[in-house]
Amino acid sequence: MISEEEKIKFLKELVEIYSPTGREEEAAKFIKEKFEEYGIEAYVDNVGNVIARKSGEGPLVLLAGHIDTVPGYIPVRIEGEVLWGRGSVDAKGPLATLFFSTIEGNANVIFAGLVDEEGFSKGARNLKIPRPDYIIVGEPSGTNGVTIGYKGSLTVRFVERVEKVHSSLGVGAAERLIEKWLEISKDFSDGFNGLNGRIVRFLAYDREFEFYGEMIINLRTPPGYVPPLEWDIIDFVPAYEVDRRSPLVRAFVKSIREAGLKPKLKKKSGTADTNILGPKFGVDAVAYGPGDSKLDHTPYERINLREYLKSIEILKAVLRKLKGG
């Protein structure tokens, strides 16, 4: 068994490696070398993902988390039982949970530390491994939570060009884009089954003979949502939801209860690599990991180290149950 001090030290060192999207190389190298120190072969693939395989008993389980973080450095420090730092919650705490569950368990596991999750998920889209039987993605769900659904993400570009007329005779490109946004947003609603979103970019100016406008929006889409065919789609990742009766979900519920906690099944308004990996391999996928997702991307990102350590034990119990133990 690996000591709690060593697990905390690993996480702190990983968080200390600043790895915003596009700059994951040092963190990937660190994880690879740590696997090798524990006697597990690992490699970095052609897109920068770090992959490790531990052969064991039972179904093949993919444990996938992301190495990259959003930008914004936070001084790394431990205060009592709390570790502060960018990525401590999203998602190096969950990634470290997957790391130690791989090492300490005797399940049949592929570990994947993925790049570009905060971008366009290049790591997940290009992951080349044998088809797993189950997928567990490292994202903050809370020690007693398991995320069974994520909304989709749709990024769209709208462009308007309006021939110049006297300012009193008509609307320009900017006004048309505003009308378009008001039409799209009039039916927004909160919740997992609602559509909502925001304007990511808005640009309008006049050229010699025309008014030009460009608007990029991001929509969070519910299950079953199909965007209009005429839209200029930059990227679309559909919503994903796993059946709560799945053996994977049941293994989490039982393991969390056995740890003395009340299980919570969660559906989130964000999007994660779960949305890509589940459909990519055609198997059940959930997300699990310590941390409060309300702290994601904020200047106050921090993780409770007791919860981190407990999450490792819960995930190891899940892996035992999946192989029939």
Swiss-Prot record:
InterPro entries: ArgE/DapE_CS, LysK, Peptidase_M20, Peptidase_M20A, Peptidase_M42. The keyword Hydrolase applies. The keyword Cytoplasm applies. It catalyses: [amino-group carrier protein]-C-terminal-gamma-(L-lysyl)-L-glutamate + H2O = [amino-group carrier protein]-C-terminal-L-glutamate + L-lysine; [amino-group carrier protein]-C-terminal-gamma-(L-ornithyl)-L-glutamate + H2O = [amino-group carrier protein]-C-terminal-L-glutamate + L-ornithine. It is an enzyme of class 3 (hydrolase). Pfam families: Peptidase_M20 (PF01546). Gene3D superfamilies: Zn peptidases (3.40.630.10). GO terms for cellular component: cytoplasm. Its EC number is 3.5.1.130, 3.5.1.132. It is found in: Cytoplasm. The active site is at 68, 117 (proton acceptor). GO terms for molecular function: cobalt ion binding; hydrolase activity, acting on carbon-nitrogen (but not peptide) bonds, in linear amides; zinc ion binding. One of its GO terms (biological process) is L-arginine biosynthetic process. Disulfide bonds: none annotated. Zn(2+) 1 binds at residues 66, 90, 139. Keywords: Amino-acid biosynthesis, Arginine biosynthesis, Cobalt, Cytoplasm, Hydrolase, Lysine biosynthesis, Metal-binding, Zinc. It comes from the Archaea. Pathway: Amino-acid biosynthesis; L-lysine biosynthesis via AAA pathway; L-lysine from L-alpha-aminoadipate (Thermus route): step 5/5; Amino-acid biosynthesis; L-arginine biosynthesis. Binds 2 Zn(2+) or Co(2+) ions per subunit. Belongs to the peptidase M20A family. LysK subfamily. This is Putative [LysW]-lysine/[LysW]-ornithine hydrolase.
